[in-house]
Amino acid sequence: MANPLYQKHIISINDLSRDDLNLVLATAAKLKANPQPELLKHKVIASCFFEASTRTRLSFETSMHRLSASVVGFSDSANTSLGKKGETLADTISVISTYVDAIVMRHPQEGAARLATEFSGQVPVLNAGDGSNQHPTQTLLDLFTIQETQGRLDNLHIAMVGDLKYGRTVHSLTQALAKFSGNRFYFIAPDALAMPQYILDMLDEKGMAWSLHGSIEEVMADVDILYMTRVQKERLDPSEYANVKAQFVLRASDLNGARENMKVLHPLPRIDEITTDVDKTPHAWYFQQAGNGIFARQALLALVLNSELSL
């Protein structure tokens, strides 16, 4: 089938329409059910990680290998010309784009991925995270997991917990879910880490219901998805961190009264905001969520690198 994502840069979740999202998710489901080990044979993909990554880098590179793409790149910019000799990002991308069919890039600077698109020519750039700005492929695997467990992406009740101010995953996921109808959001965070006003304004503009809460217990019985994030110690005064840390920890006993099919998600890594006794409950789904990153990223790579795709 012809697809609108061929050679498209994927920098922000807002680069994808609702139809685009549905296309990626449908493709991911097909690849999970029916692997296509030679789909990207003869393609060369650059995996350019200018900062450390575990799940995202390994997930992307596994996705590439399982589709038979050749992978080049680096996991740390310290030993590159950019890191050792002061080469500009623009020159680095200009050169790399002459070698490869696509560039997957993580960078600590917000806006770096968008900047890279100005120097990559016809080679698509896929953002694997740029600072605290965007992480669109995390959102795709989140959506895939929600759809897989709940059977839909509309008319859901979603709670987001923890660092909602600086956490790029919750911003992107809220923006993506707002493209679907009837979703209702519960935001649970300390005042210092509340969801940014621009996200709340966006929900108001779309007529989406949302509310603010001080504890997980307030909403446990009402939600389909509980999306946990880490409260970042470095963002808070030490005394304030000590106060809020215990308030936003999920324990197995907190799941009493939860809906039978409610799933707990987390972008990982977790520190201590989900106790290990939760892992043994049927609600825990964060490791399966991480595994779905393979299929979401395979789908995106396949669509970006094939003008027509028949699965």
UniProtKB/Swiss-Prot annotation:
One of its GO terms (molecular function) is aspartate carbamoyltransferase activity. Belongs to the aspartate/ornithine carbamoyltransferase superfamily. ATCase family. It comes from the Bacteria. Keywords: Pyrimidine biosynthesis, Transferase. It catalyses: carbamoyl phosphate + L-aspartate = N-carbamoyl-L-aspartate + phosphate + H(+). Signal peptide: none annotated. L-aspartate binds at K85, R168, R230. It holds the Pfam family OTCace_N. Carbamoyl phosphate binds at R55, T56, R106, H135, Q138, L268, P269. This is Aspartate carbamoyltransferase catalytic subunit. Pathway: Pyrimidine metabolism; UMP biosynthesis via de novo pathway; (S)-dihydroorotate from bicarbonate: step 2/3. It is an enzyme of class 2 (transferase). The gene is pyrB. GO terms for cellular component: cytosol. Catalyzes the condensation of carbamoyl phosphate and aspartate to form carbamoyl aspartate and inorganic phosphate, the committed step in the de novo pyrimidine nucleotide biosynthesis pathway. Its EC number is 2.1.3.2. InterPro entries: Asp/Orn_carbamoyltranf_P-bd, Asp/Orn_carbamoylTrfase, Asp/Orn_carbamoylTrfase_sf, Asp_carbamoyltransf, Asp_carbamoyltransf_Asp/Orn-bd. Heterododecamer (2C3:3R2) of six catalytic PyrB chains organized as two trimers (C3), and six regulatory PyrI chains organized as three dimers (R2). PANTHER family: ASPARTATE CARBAMOYLTRANSFERASE, ORNITHINE CARBAMOYLTRANSFERASE, MITOCHONDRIAL. One of its GO terms (biological process) is 'de novo' pyrimidine nucleobase biosynthetic process.
